[in-house]
Amino acid sequence: MAAPRTLLLCPPSLSAHPEALNKIYEIHDRSTADLQMLDRIAAGLVQLPAATYDVVLLLTDADGTTRESHKLLARDVASKVAGALKVGGILKAKTEAILAGLSESPNGMVKTEQVESVSIPLKFGKKKTNGVNGTNGAVNPDGSVPLNLNGKRNQPEPVKPVGVGFVDFSDDLDDPIITGEDDDDDLIDEDDLITEEDMARPVIQQCRPKAGKRRRACKDCTCGLKEKMEAEDAAKRTTADKALNTMKLGADDLDELDFTVQGKVGSCGNCALGDAFRCDGCPYIGLPAFKPGEEVRLLNNDIQL
């Protein structure tokens, strides 16, 4: 009997630790064990042979955890590993193994034999009558059992309330046996309900504006997007006109302001701050600083405050 073959799935971090790999080969004989890197299998650089290995062992990372191994053991890699297992083979790792078609066992994840599914038709027959030989459990006063030879029921019909209708669910109404194989004679083909006129009718596509761009209405827009955009443009235009009207200046607004009036300042706003803040053409150059609103008179080049 051939020795069981083992596939060792190694994370890339172990390749930088040869001492760890040597310990692994001390436990597993190289003649019966194959070592493959998980990243090479995930990249498609290594093709695993089909139905070859009895045991697949997922090795831990260099730090003793399985984070890197579980990250690389994705569903497609797990499917490749499951294909390399023999029937009854064991994969000692749970990540994505069940989704790859493996079953859990006390020793690990086992590859079970695939059995083709068989469809079984269900047949529904008539409801069986109670009792034996169609007697419905009825017994005569003398202890004898009446036999129903004509196959019909002898029970009297229940009295129906006046003005009230009900359905007797115990009556099978002598319907034929349902075999589950429906007759297609009563089915209507949906394509027969569509006429040539329906096929030629154009289908109006829904307006679906692209993200990041301004919506544009179709030329023959019927969904109301065109009217909505026109209303938005009109509202923006009205807002802009109102803002423009507030910025217009009249003739009175352009006149020079008299600094002698309380609360008013000159056009430059610095007439009352002294020469250091006055313009070149200011008529008050050389005059001392004065308070806004203070009356200033010039008489024979003398300052009269």
Curated annotation (Swiss-Prot):
GO terms for cellular component: cytoplasm; cytosolic [4Fe-4S] assembly targeting complex; mitochondrial intermembrane space. Residues 207-223 are annotated as: Fe-S binding site A. Residues 268-282 are annotated as: Fe-S binding site B. Keywords: 2Fe-2S, 4Fe-4S, Cytoplasm, Iron, Iron-sulfur, Metal-binding, Mitochondrion. A motif (Cx2C motif 1) lies at residues 268-271. One of its GO terms (biological process) is cellular response to oxidative stress. Gene3D superfamilies: Fe-S cluster assembly protein Dre2, N-terminal domain. It comes from the Eukaryota. [4Fe-4S] cluster binds at C268, C271, C279, C282. Monomer. Interacts with TAH18. Interacts with MIA40. The C-terminal domain binds 2 Fe-S clusters but is otherwise mostly in an intrinsically disordered conformation. The N-terminal domain has structural similarity with S-adenosyl-L-methionine-dependent methyltransferases, but does not bind S-adenosyl-L-methionine. It is required for correct assembly of the 2 Fe-S clusters. Belongs to the anamorsin family. This is Fe-S cluster assembly protein DRE2. It comes from Phaeosphaeria nodorum (strain SN15 / ATCC MYA-4574 / FGSC 10173).
